[in-house]
Amino acid sequence: MDRCALCPGKFNVVPPSGPEDSDVVFIGEAPGKDEDRQIIPFVGKTGRELNEHYLPLCGLRRDAVRIGNSIRCLPDRPQGRLDISRDKDRELLESCSAEPGGILAELEKARPRLIVPMGVLACYALDPDINLELQHGIPLETSWGTVFPMYHPAGGLHEPKKMLMIRNDWVRLGKYLKGKLKLSVDPYPDTDYREALPDELLEFPACNDYTFPLACDTESNRKREPFCLSYSFCPGTGRLIRAEDTETLSMFQAMLDHWEGPILFHNWMYDSHVVERMGLRFPHKRIVDTMVRAYHLGNLAQGLKALAYRLLGMRMSDFDDVVTPYSTPLCLSYLREAVNHEWPKPDEQTVRDPQGQWKLYKPQSMGTKLKRFLTDYSKHPDKDVFQAWDNWEDDHAQIEMVCGEWPGKSIEHVPMDKTIHYACRDADATLRLWPVLQGMTRQVRRKLSEHWED
């Protein structure tokens, strides 16, 4: 490859190693100093971890697989580790991986049976839609064929708490290669999510008892004011109560007062403040936090979406994915209305230049600044308008004083049918997670008991 303008201080190009016709190709992120010196990928400390510990876990030998990197030279890193959220690092990754001699060209030519990207950068180079937190250790069908995303082997060296998670993924890879990996499949593809009716809660005691687990979740607006409560006591179902529906909330409270089973929340520390502002009183001795349970197990993600996907096969939408499509047009409309307002011209000011001379300075009007903001956004429509607003150096207070409060991201902007599905699915997922986490906890306790008996 030619010397890259994005990385003028690069050293040696480190090509992949291993048989070119290998059925399995591993992709790392970028060479380190040891790799640059020996011109072989994964020969340093991380390489030893990979070759001596992880590859044997899945029954593979280093000389039997193809191993390369998304970025094929030691990049300049004045800011430290490469970060996909930085524009320059992302540009470097996209440019290097797409080079004629880069890793993507090699994959296009070889078309291996299985591709294993290791780390966020490698996953992004292969497919920006891969969500490593959700999908690590799970085979995916992509345009490249079957992909098995993994955390980078160095992850366990930098973050010891990740080591067990990484180890488990390599064991899963071995099972997959042998055809023995069992994947979670959502057993409830057809769900019943809707608003709760007062009659439903009135009839509840006649057809149910109060000893079953009850899962709850809350949603609030951007001011942290309560928006709704969702709950589920039967897998595949969920009900939503709006915060302003005091009649249904009072009936729900009557049901809570008699509840004898566990009441499940995922992150009770957050939800407790919301339910308190809704006027609901939950019996604290019944509360079980599934996020805390996942944390205590040690090798699991704590996010509800990641847990539900990995353990239950449930696909769930992130908050931003639900809210952004409806909040963005409102925010852009707000800015366009603000531009059309007749803003006063600011007074001229005298400022001292770098040479110490006093000069007359004419500040831009707020209208001009807003036009520049919108022009910049129109040139980069994929830009996050909310982040751009938060990062805007000018004072927001003047605009909000004239035009009203900035809409921002809020669940209030989402159509109610979408909100019902999103909120009820959270409660449903929490309910379904409970028996799985219970089983995993019992398994850990049994192993500990056997260990101490030995």
Regions found by a protein language model. Give the residues of each.
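Active-site-proximal helix-loop-helix substrate-binding element of RNase H-like nuclease domains
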Residues: 167, 178-195, 224-442
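Short hydrophobic beta-strand that contains or immediately precedes a catalytic carboxylate
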Residues: 25-27, 150, 214-217, 265, ...
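Acidic catalytic cores of enzymes that act on phosphate-bearing nucleotides/polynucleotides
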Residues: 441-454
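A short acidic-Thr-Gly-centered motif at the start of a beta-strand
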Residues: 14-19, 195-212, 253-258
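Two-metal-ion RNase H-like nuclease active-site motif
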Residues: 209-221
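A polyanion-binding, active-site-adjacent surface
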Residues: 1-181
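Short, flexible loop/turn motifs enriched in small residues
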Residues: 18-21, 222-227
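Short, glycine/acidic-enriched loop or turn micro-motifs at the edges of active sites
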Residues: 31-32, 72, 155, 218-222, ...
